[in-house]
Amino acid sequence: MNPLAPVLTIDGPSGAGKGTISRIVARRMGWHYLDSGALYRAVGVAASWADIDTSDASALVRCTFDTHVQFVEQGEAMRVMVNGTDATDELRLETTGALASAIAAIPEVRAALKERQRAFRELPGLVADGRDMGTVIFPDASYKVFLTASAEERAERRHKQLKDKGVSVNFDDLLREIMARDARDAQRTVAPLKPADDAVLIDTTGIGIDDVVARVMDLLPVPAA
């Protein structure tokens, strides 16, 4: 970790566009990228592979330390390797997201992952995408953004994403899952989902990706040539 490296945190609920916006901005700035949600999902997948119950906090903490995660760029896409296995597709499943949300509510797991996330802070800079990047992991970040969108729009985006992949899912079920996850994330006692006091709030409902990226880039220094 390099404490001198500038950090942009992009927080928000599932489906607000954090991942897409963060990857584009990181690429344009030439900065490192941290997908904190993928770390929690990776632990969830590893725990599932090892048949660890989500109520077994000590086993989950051990799993957190034992799980090796790599982000590998393939063109415009980002693949996530978990213990040497490409788990990208499994990480995107709604069931994995629900599992990650449950695991994220365990204080011991969050504590174990805190330093691992901070280790991504290196020069020339870092774009950190998550739910508590600006409030807990990088409270001293120079640039903070909180993205949001209506639950209906986020469900619509996810529904289209899954449909494009040939995955059949009921929209109403998807909407209920997103709303339930929002409630869990906002009500948990440890690091609840909320914008940092000094974050710039951007509602992405009805706004295109290019416009959101432009708003975020306006907050940052001019990228190095």
From Swiss-Prot:
InterPro entries: Cytidylate_kin, Cytidylate_kinase_dom, P-loop_NTPase. It catalyses: CMP + ATP = CDP + ADP; dCMP + ATP = dCDP + ADP. The keyword Nucleotide-binding applies. The keyword Cytoplasm applies. The lineage of its organism: Bacteria, Pseudomonadati, Pseudomonadota, Gammaproteobacteria, Lysobacterales. This is Cytidylate kinase. Its EC number is 2.7.4.25. It is an enzyme of class 2 (transferase). Gene3D superfamilies: P-loop containing nucleotide triphosphate hydrolases. Belongs to the cytidylate kinase family. Type 1 subfamily. The gene is cmk. It is found in: Cytoplasm. GO terms for cellular component: cytosol. ATP binds at G12, P13, S14, G15, A16, G17, K18, G19, T20.
